[in-house]
Amino acid sequence: MLRLSERNMKVLFAAALIVGSVVFLLLPGPSVANDKKKGPKVTVKVYFDLQIGDESVGRVVFGLFGKTVPKTVDNFVALATGEKGFGYKNSKFHRVIKDFMIQGGDFTRGDGTGGKSIYGERFPDENFKLKHYGPGWVSMANAGKDTNGSQFFITTVKTSWLDGKHVVFGKVLEGMDVVRKVESTKTDSRDKPLKDVIIVDSGKIEVEKPFAIAKE
């Protein structure tokens, strides 16, 4: 009986070790949990100084994801600096929809029918790795597949129905309160602001070391 009990104890002990190992494997480690929180890396920043009517409302700073969507980011940065001889400076946010987004980037016509990229009139969708996770994400406006130009929008809510259709390439790091001011401006029946919302200045801010941001 003693030998049988010892054997049973060994079997039970081995089973406990196996079960414990399985439970340990199923539990997410710190690195897994952290990976879920980590989002894309900001490689460069761009700023917009905005004005509504005659009133200066502040600066918006965007973090852009140059490793994830390099071509899209290069386009946005070049248009912000004006290094190609054209770009966002003095252009308008022509479309504002509360609880959805604010849209700008049409520096040729100012009504949502124009704009152009540094690669030509239009360029293809780079990828859809990033999603419209919530307020403050910056994405390319388009007229369908592979029709990216210079127009973009900033979300003011989560817009998951746009995932896989619009290329996300940045996020507001500073000045979300300024975005909210634009979102709250009065518009006409076609969502055009009654007072011009103008990018009075724009430019590039270097990032010494890329850093990840949360997807929330």
Swiss-Prot record:
Residue span, PPIase cyclophilin-type domain: 47-204
Signal peptide: 1-33
Class of this enzyme: isomerase
One GO term of the biological process aspect: neutrophil chemotaxis
Keyword Isomerase set for record: yes
Matches recorded under Gene3D superfamilies: Cyclophilin-like
Cellular component, GO annotation: endoplasmic reticulum chaperone complex; endoplasmic reticulum lumen; melanosome; nucleoplasm; perinuclear region of cytoplasm; protein-containing complex; smooth endoplasmic reticulum
Keywords, ordered alphabetically: Acetylation, Endoplasmic reticulum, Isomerase, Rotamase, Signal
UniProt superkingdom: Eukaryota
Compartment(s) where it occurs, according to its Swiss-Prot or TrEMBL record: Endoplasmic reticulum lumen; Melanosome
One matching Pfam family: Pro_isomerase
Name of the protein in its database record: Peptidyl-prolyl cis-trans isomerase B
Gene name linked to the record: Ppib
